[in-house]
A protein has these predicted regions:
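N-terminal Rossmann NAD(P)H-binding glycine-rich loop of SDR-like oxidoreductase domains
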Residues: 1-25
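Non-catalytic, hydrophobic alpha-helical segments
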Residues: 12, 70, 152, 183-187, ...
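Conserved Rossmann-fold NAD(P)-dependent oxidoreductase catalytic core, especially the SDR/UDP-sugar
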Residues: 26-28, 34, 76-141, 145, ...
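NAD(P)H-binding glycine-rich loop region in Rossmannoid oxidoreductase-like domains
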Residues: 29-95, 99-102, 191-195
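Flexible, glycine-rich beta-alpha linker
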Residues: 118, 150-169, 203
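Glycine/proline-rich active-site loop of Rossmann-fold NAD(P)-dependent oxidoreductases
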Residues: 120, 161-166, 190-199
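Substrate-positioning beta->alpha
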Residues: 134, 174-189, 199
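Core catalytic loop region at the nicotinamide-binding pocket of NAD(P)H-dependent oxidoreductases
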Residues: 190-214
Length: 221
């Protein structure tokens, strides 16, 4: 499988790149700077310098020709401000989908977040509200497309080692954290699961092995 990951230097992306490379997939990660390329090479991925906020649609689509699946793992990050929340978490996700459709890519997986429906809740700061709204807008755009999309909404992300055991379901799960290791494992499983097309799933730490959790979530949902 040939997979391209936007936000290829992110902590989930690097884990997913390694998982895919280890099983023999061809993996490319789009990164913002040449200084990040060595980190991708160390996990077995090919890094491509591509700023999603400035690249043209035609150039981005050209780089996706012949690709089997794309994963949107990019994000503006904490402290980036409301403007970049919109330009990256929404705008770049939309453009990546435009490019994938133009290139004929059959699958698009988006890493979103739990809690989108809470945007603007009492006591929530404006930047986080804008982040949730940007993610919600990106999700809505993707659902309206013909591409084979899947949206994964993990809970709060942790860097502690994953267990390989998760809880996965259609929205909405009780709010709970999940290790980035396990998010990457679930993404790999979803890439291999055609039945995940057109589904939105929420993910936390749990008690089911990843493959079983995916099977059950798709059967029930």
């Amino acid at each position: 499988m040939h997979v391209v990951i936007a936000g290829g230097h992110g902590r989930i992306a690097l884990r997913l790149e390694q998982l895919l490379a280890e099983r023999g997939d061809s993996v490319e990660g789009l990164v913002r700077s040449a200084g990040q390329l060595d980190d991708l090479a160390r996990v077995g991925a090919r890094g491509v310098v591509c700023d999603l906020e400035t690249v043209s649609l035609e150039d981005l689509a050209g780089g996706l020709s012949g690709v089997d699946a794309v994963v949107f793992a990019a994000g503006a990050g904490p402290g980036s401000g409301s403007t970049r929340k919109d330009s990256v978490d929404r705008g770049a996700a939309v453009m990546f989908a435009d490019a994938a459709e133009l290139a004929g890519v059959p699958r698009y997986l988006m890493i979103s977040t739990m809690g989108i429906e809470r945007a603007g809740a009492a006591g929530m700061d404006q930047e986080f509200t804008d982040y949730l709204r940007a993610k919600g807008a990106a999700e809505a755009d993707l659902r309206a497309r013909e591409i084979g999309w899947t949206i994964l909404r993990p809970g709060p992300l942790m860097d502690e080692p994953g267990s390989g055991f998760v809880r996965l379901a259609v929205p909405s799960l009780p709010f709970a954290p999940v290790p980035r290791d396990d998010v990457a494992l679930v993404l790999r499983e979803l890439l291999d699961t055609p039945a995940a097309v057109g589904r939105t799933l929420e993910l936390t730490a749990g008690a089911e092995p990843v493959a079983e959790a995916v099977r059950v979530a798709l059967a029930v949902g």
